[in-house]
Amino acid sequence: ILVALVTTSQDPWQGETAVEGSLDADALITGFKDLLLSLEQDRKLAGKFAGILHITNDSIADVVQSDRTELLYGQEYFYEELLGLKFKISTFSFFQTNSYSAEVLYQTARDYVGDLGGSDKTVFDLYSGTGTIAQLMAPAAGKVIGVEIVEEAVEAAKKNAAANGLDNCEFIAGDVLKVLDEVEEKPDMIILDPPRDGIHPKALPKIIAYDVEHIV
């Protein structure tokens, strides 16, 4: 288990007198860490905590960003295994939290590749994040191309693919809308896992124009 406490550095009292009995930030964070570690006394959680982190986030966006990350306990990552491949997971890695259900989902997608006669087929994994899906498709495909706009995620994908011994994965950092105009390969199958705001309206016609049999 990797746990992150996210707080803001902004003063909630804004110069006013704090409510009597309220905790300062340091006391709150220490108490949070101690409470979690005390849970390890429960045999069900013994040895389960890989790390505990404190993230300071002053952004007003609806997603967590790190202005500062402090490691309170353990390490900043852990390893998860899916369908025989190992992935290094950190706080900001996008990874399915229910790994058992994820395996069923990913195996189904991999079976689609196999049904295409996958050994010489090309798969596009668009909005690929840290490349989890792309790498899981790689053993059944000739080549997998992942496209992701976040450069840090692309670097993580490359490292995980190398660690898994996969040499048929290519990860490209860039906007799907623009990258599709630059990639020469044509896909036999496309996997889409876009962010919350969905697929760019101008990218969708380009994806459809590939006229592939399977879009997952």
Each PLM stretch: what is its role?
Residues 12-216:
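Rossmann-like S-adenosyl-L-methionine
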Residues 2-11:
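Carbohydrate-binding surface patches
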